[in-house]
């Protein structure tokens, strides 16, 4: 895992026990999972809009910025649920060499 993700995961864990007024992440944890999920949704929409704007203008600066926000809030979500970013990287690694169609077909149907 990249050093940046390792360091970020450690900071996210530390902030779980911090006072809500001490940091943005601590305030998100304090507000609960629904607020964190709301932020993930908000950042998803902003990334989509930035992608559409980048396609039209050729300028990807906002797209990179909004994608970083989306990744960050997704990592907060994972951390809130007791998951480490390495689990996502492991899943991506597992998918290497696996056809997207085969991977989708192999998934267990949702109940």
Curated annotation (Swiss-Prot):
Indicate where this protein is primarily found: cytoplasm
What would be one Pfam family of this protein?
PRA-PH
Q: List where in the cell it is found.
A: Cytoplasm
The alphabetized list of GO BP terms reads: L-histidine biosynthetic process
| Enzyme Commission number | 3.6.1.31
**Keyword ATP-binding assigned:** yes
Q: Which GO terms describe its cellular component?
A: cytoplasm
Task: Output the Gene Ontology terms for molecular function.
Answer: ATP binding; phosphoribosyl-ATP diphosphatase activity
Keywords of this protein's UniProt record, alphabetized? Amino-acid biosynthesis, ATP-binding, Cytoplasm, Histidine biosynthesis, Hydrolase, Nucleotide-binding
Q: Can the keyword ATP-binding be found in this entry's annotation? A: yes
Catalytic activity annotation: 1-(5-phospho-beta-D-ribosyl)-ATP + H2O = 1-(5-phospho-beta-D-ribosyl)-5'-AMP + diphosphate + H(+)
* Record pathway: Amino-acid biosynthesis; L-histidine biosynthesis; L-histidine from 5-phospho-alpha-D-ribose 1-diphosphate: step 2/9
Q: Which SUPFAM superfamilies match?
A: all-alpha NTP pyrophosphatases (SSF101386)
**Stored NCBIfam families:** histidine_hisI (TIGR03188), PRK00400.1-3 (NF001611)
Concerning its family, UniProt says: Belongs to the PRA-PH family.
Q: What is this protein called?
A: Phosphoribosyl-ATP pyrophosphatase
